Amino acid sequence: MDLSDAYENAAYIPEATGYLERWPVQAAAFRESHGARARLDLRYGPDARNRYDLFLPDGAAAGLAVFVHGGYWHKFDKSFWSHLAAGPVARGWAVAMPSYTLAPEARISQITREVAAALAAAS
């Protein structure tokens, strides 16, 4: 089994490159349209990628949803996925989207500690 291949899902998704081109544009448009209810680049730790975005609904939040981005721990960051907060935010939920140090710079154990710290900061 080629482990590199096992982590490259895009090769198995028809027209995957289209998503990779559209999503950053959609994410940026969502951040811009959300205005003051988009709290961007909030720090949760000392490392460069220890930041999260928080998207708030109108009025009091029903709760907090946290979206930990994919990329098999070695690519992407929070800014790639912002538009995926639209549904929960429209239904009254706050949404936190953390970035974290990527592999191979960080091991999975460090990444999970960083995600836990982001959860604590956002809660």
Task: Go through the PLM ranges and name each one.
Residues 3-60:
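N-terminal cap/lid segment of alpha/beta-hydrolase-fold proteins
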Residues 13, 72, 102:
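Short histidine/acidic/glycine/proline-rich micro-motifs that form metal-
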Residues 46, 71-72:
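Gly/Ser/Thr-rich helix-start
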Residues 62-71:
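Short beta-strand element of the alpha/beta-hydrolase
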Residues 76-85, 96-123:
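Catalytic nucleophile-loop/oxyanion-hole region of alpha/beta-hydrolase
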